[in-house]
């Protein structure tokens, strides 16, 4: 037996180690870091030794056969003409060692595989080996010549309509009922046939593709995808932000024909808007974020999973938005296709906008058409009509309308657009960059509702009734405007065709791009982040994350809102008005007065029903208000909680209401430095914004009626003796407010609104009031800035005339106590010193 360390035994082991070392050298030489020349050189240098090692292992001497084999292996390694030359020398030599010859398979009889194993074409989570018939073919669309992504957008309006608004007689035979049609391929009146078929074909290609795979490719392909929803509820909010900017803020800052704003933050009128078919409410969240408490929204959408999600309004105060679901109010179903819902919503909006209507209406209706994407226009025709009808029902004269549409190929859709074209000053079809380019979505934007559109509204109302009657039948309304009428307006028709064809071309390229991005997962849009920043900057949207508002305790929020103001001010009590202090109300023109119904308190709103009150004493705590009401966060008011009464006798109803005496901070807006009259005006505006007429179960919020002191007599006219429940049938003094509710008055607050050293007087020669500075002796009719008494001056200097026992302010009361200040004394003093 040979030992392990015998020379003959160890020789093969040494040779094997030598071959491993040579192989390592070759691997090093063939690494990707070396240039091709060094790899080839290393391969040449090692070929002979590799062949020799193999021959020694096999126990063969160098002969002609082994030389030929080595030569062939060498040729395989070095052959640049070989289709295998792309592989490094080591892999080629290993194949040569196994007897590989180009064009032949491995094995004794060359029976092995001759072709290289293809790289995997696996796409995402598809089944292994699955190919999607019809999708993997080429679309033959060059999408690479699309315009460079940009934040700048152009608007193209329809020409101004010169045709008169059609009347009832003219439209009497316009509606055409025909056989229900469920094909779109032949709708070529307002789009070229080739383009129409191309876009439908491109859409159909995606029918077999998995939704997730499509969405991933779309996300990478869309240069505007990263804009998303920023800090808003959803992407819809950013669409509205996008279009509001493009259309020169015509929604959040509407202007008249001269360019002057129709509503101003400092003035009393709110910006009224409506949002229909709009759950969960992204459009409204944007408007309320932009306008804050200077806007009031009304909403109607289908109840259910896609209802308004007001609790998710993180960036705006949902207390300024009032959902109303048509017939039945808050208990309705919100179905806009039901005529009774349209009528109920119209009446509700008009009742709460002084019969004027809203400044603008937004509509973003849509529903799932999965599996029938090409028929979306036909399936949603009634929804589109009802949204247009709602605009003509609730938008005020001069107001605006924006509504989502889809494809507009059919004469039915074109007819609806034509009616808007007749009823508004200007109309356009617009696709914002925040709307994904591959979908059929775009918006019809209408500016300036004309006078005299009632007949068109009534006509569309009748068409909707007919559509409801034809449900589940083979018939349908196919036309709302005759084709010859539409085509008779050449400018309108040309615009429709141009818009449709331009939109089709955009869609085709976008769909082809997504198709390419599905097939090649390495493709991506490099400028998404850059475009996002540019758009947000241009639209005035802060680049912030969406986070829920932080909660706070009332005391901390109070100190945050008053911003270092001396807290002792809030503990001041009013000076009692008596015979001794009557002189304090001179000059009379400097003062205003309000009827009191209970103790004054400070009220803070932290959002929704998180409302607390405090009596002003530092030793006392903020107490949760036990009333059913809602206020926007960051609100601080001076109020009374008053028990209001309606009716008399057994039918008398009692309700607790919040009466505002003065305002400090409104939804984060500090108004303490403004004039008292301005603060009261803003308070009334604020109350309109937060009031919920659809919710009679909620406790009301009202602003105290303010009287000029020289007109105090008007207050006594509103006083009467009434029997109040629980008063043993004894009539009590009652004050009746503007809303026909009455309460038991406790006295009169008298507030000075002019700051020292200024005072007010009346010019007999000019018949008007003026301001006079007691120090400088300057007189002026204009309001001097330093004459405005801020909140703390008004609060500190107020007086209170208590109407307790012995004070006779109504003829039916007990006789006046001669030791107390009488009504006659006060009125006489006012009359004497107001002349």
Swiss-Prot record:
RrmJ-type SAM-dependent 2'-O-MTase domain mapped to chain residues: 231-450
Biased composition (Basic and acidic residues): 57-68
Modified residues (N6-acetyllysine): 108
Cross-referenced SUPFAM superfamilies: S-adenosyl-L-methionine-dependent methyltransferases
GO biological process terms held by the UniProt record: 7-methylguanosine mRNA capping; methylation; mRNA processing
InterPro entries: G_patch_dom, mRNA_Cap_2O-Ribose_MeTrfase, RNA_MeTrfase_FtsJ_dom, RrmJ-type_MeTrfase, SAM-dependent_MTases_sf, WW_dom
Chain positions recorded as substrate binding sites: 203-207, 218, 374-376, 439
Alphabetical list of SMART domains matching this protein: G_patch, WW
Catalytic center residues: 239, 364, 404
GO molecular function: mRNA (nucleoside-2'-O-)-methyltransferase activity; nucleic acid binding
Chain intervals for the UniProt region annotation (Disordered): 24-68
EC number: 2.1.1.57
Short sequence motif Bipartite nuclear localization signal: positions: 2-19
Domain G-patch residues, every copy: 87-133
Domain of life: Eukaryota
WW domain mapped to chain residues: 752-786
Function: S-adenosyl-L-methionine-dependent methyltransferase that mediates mRNA cap1 2'-O-ribose methylation to the 5'-cap structure of mRNAs. Methylates the ribose of the first nucleotide of a m(7)GpppG-capped mRNA and small nuclear RNA (snRNA) to produce m(7)GpppRm (cap1). Displays a preference for cap0 transcripts. Cap1 modification is linked to higher levels of translation. May be involved in the interferon response pathway.
Summary of subunit composition and partner proteins: Interacts with POLR2A (via C-terminus).
Name of the featured protein: Cap-specific mRNA (nucleoside-2'-O-)-methyltransferase 1
Organism: Ailuropoda melanoleuca
